[in-house]
A protein has these predicted regions:
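Short acidic-rich active-site patches of cyclic nucleotide enzymes
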Residues: 60
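Short Pro-Cys-Gly-centered "Cys-loop" motif that presents a nucleophilic cysteine in a tight turn
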Residues: 1-57, 66-277
Length: 277
């Protein structure tokens, strides 16, 4: 199982999901769901998370989290670990509850968080578990729409602020917005299965990731062009572009060109004064 996403920085926004092992239920009854939300409340307070939306299904959950500190991986490890232990004690079982680790997509807040908030609370409607989002008790919809008090872990101010300053009017507009959302999917700009955002957002993330050695190279450069396309008919400048701009290693370039990596290194040094690399 691949390591989960390790792109962590203050202000990062994530769509997080985790599924039951072998598609088994991770929530068998209401006490399980309350236990999970209580655990989540403790974790988000400890690690400085803001929750904009959530939905608990039967064999998986969705969370939309904004981190004030770079703590996603530590917090998720605690959330799933503590809940698994409590679930196993309660149901007198042993073994894994979740299918591997969680999955997280880092999200461009301004462009995609609003649509994702709608997508998450419509999940029960899409799978025909209920007819409307308001009929599902275990999501953030009812609290955001003003139908029930908001739990302490849910931050609704940003979301409702997208619909106006007057609270009741914003809630009414939010209800209309969700009602009109069936059939819409927010994943058109998903890149590499772990990024949702524009090219400018990707460029900013790439700059951040260059400073994070723990991020796998394939995640640092999710939208880079193929090596053969970079090197085609570009000579030494192509080598410089592949190495400096797109993060290909000397060994990768050498293997592609079928030369020794020392040859690639020597050709690369010739381009050190090239300004457009």
């Amino acid at each position: 199982m691949a390591r989960p996403l390790r792109i962590e920085y203050p202000g990062a926004v994530y769509h997080v999901t985790a599924r039951g092992n072998a598609r088994q239920p991770i929530f068998r009854d209401e006490p399980d769901r309350r236990l999970f939300l209580s655990t989540f409340d403790h974790v988000r307070a400890r690690y400085g998370w803001l929750c904009h939306a959530y939905c608990l299904m039967t064999n998986h959950y969705h969370l939309l989290i904004e981190t004030t500190r770079p703590t996603l991986s530590r917090g998720m490890r605690q959330l799933n670990g503590v809940y698994t232990q409590a679930f196993n004690r309660r149901h007198r079982r042993v073994g894994h509850l979740f299918q591997g680790r969680y999955h997280a997509v880092v999200v461009e807040k301004e462009a995609h968080l609003l649509e994702l908030c709608r997508y998450v609370v419509l999940n029960p409607v899409r799978v025909k578990a209920c007819r409307t989002a308001g009929k599902w008790r275990w999501s953030s919809y009812r609290a955001t729409a003003g139908l029930t008090p908001a739990p302490p872990f849910l931050r609704i101010d940003w979301l409702l602020g997208q619909f106006g300053q007057a609270r009741r009017q914003a809630q009414a507009r939010y209800r209309t917005f969700v009602r009109e959302g069936l059939g819409r999917h927010p994943w058109q700009n998903l890149r590499g299965q772990i990024y949702l955002g524009s090219e400018d957002f990707m460029a900013r993330l790439t700059t951040k990731m260059e400073r994070q050695q723990e991020v796998p190279r394939v995640q640092r450069h999710p939208v880079r062009p193929r090596l053969e396309d970079i090197l085609r008919s570009r000579g030494d400048q192509g080598i410089a572009v592949a190495y400096r701009r797109h993060g290909y290693r000397l060994r990768e370039i050498a293997d592609h060109l079928r030369v020794h990596y020392a040859t690639v290194s020597r050709r690369l040094r010739k381009t050190e004064d090239v300004r457009d690399v």
